Amino acid sequence: MSADQPRKTPLRGRLPLFLCLAFVSLLTTLDARAAEILLTGAQDTPGVQSFTQALQARRPQDNVRFAPLASLPSPDRLPGDVRLVLLDPPSLDWRLQKNHGPATLVLRISRLQAYERLGEATPERLSLLWSDPPMARQLQLIRRVLPQVRRVGVLFDRHSEFLLKDIQQAARPLGLEIVSERWDDSSDNRPLQNLLGRSDVLLGLDDPDLYNPKTVKNLLLSSYARQRALIGPSAAFVRAGSLASTYSDQDDWLAILDELLDRPTASWPRTLYPVRFKVMSNQQVARSLGIEPIDAEAVAAQLAEGEHRP
């Protein structure tokens, strides 16, 4: 080798330096992209802990944590880049104290809970993720499992009356007639009996004044005495004795939340029904009403396909 030939730095010496720099760059990039996701609610229950841990497992690149509502400052004192997830009505009441604050996802809030607090308005930087199954989906479920029915009975009270317009709009393209009856006093059975006499099936609303543990027995016995099925209002009611309902479980909500958190907060919807869902049916009730067995998975797939079709 010539004495004046330049010496080359051995590759073996340069490689560790290159890998070190690349690793530091990767860590810096990941740290810059990590989001601060704050879940809050009035109580730190085992269910809340399980949900938080499941979201942490889905988003290991982010800082996902739960903080009890009582430990937080007012919303306008939180960092603006925090992504806030509210888990219950008390946390929504806290968020509504201030107009300013971080972008907020209100998880699993019912239409009634929102209407009582907001009316028809949706404040800026709030995204309301409805816990109710959309009425259009529930009516499609009726068409799938009870294709012969035409008159759909709906009980309502002063709290849920505002939902009737949406139900009627959803029923019209399906050729279904909505027959409604006001039921302000659940101890008076006459409105229920009157409605059952004028309808082919009963569609339950997510209205706890009408559908609750105290009214469930009367609702179900009265309906089935007239050979009328009850659809909805929830999976819990199906377990109690209604025929069927669409619903979204924790896995569905985790997937929905995960998808939203991947998006810029400016693109979050103002309101959103759960796009992922399942169907639950009560086969014993189906048999007692002389209804063909319901394949819940197949019906859910058919409903989802219909919603995604242009």
Language-model features and meaning:
Residues 1-12:
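N-terminal secretory signal peptides that target proteins for export/translocation
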Residues 7, 15-16, 50:
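Polar low-complexity intrinsically disordered regions enriched in Ser/Thr and small residues
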Residues 16-28:
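Bacterial N-terminal signal peptides
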Residues 8, 27-28, 39, 103:
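Intrinsically disordered/low-complexity terminal segments and short unstructured peptides
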Residues 34-310:
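Short hydrophobic alpha-helices and adjacent helix-cap/hinge residues
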Residues 13-14, 207:
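Intrinsically disordered, low-complexity serine/threonine-rich segments
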Residues 28-34:
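Bacterial Sec-dependent signal peptides at the C-terminal "C-region" and cleavage site
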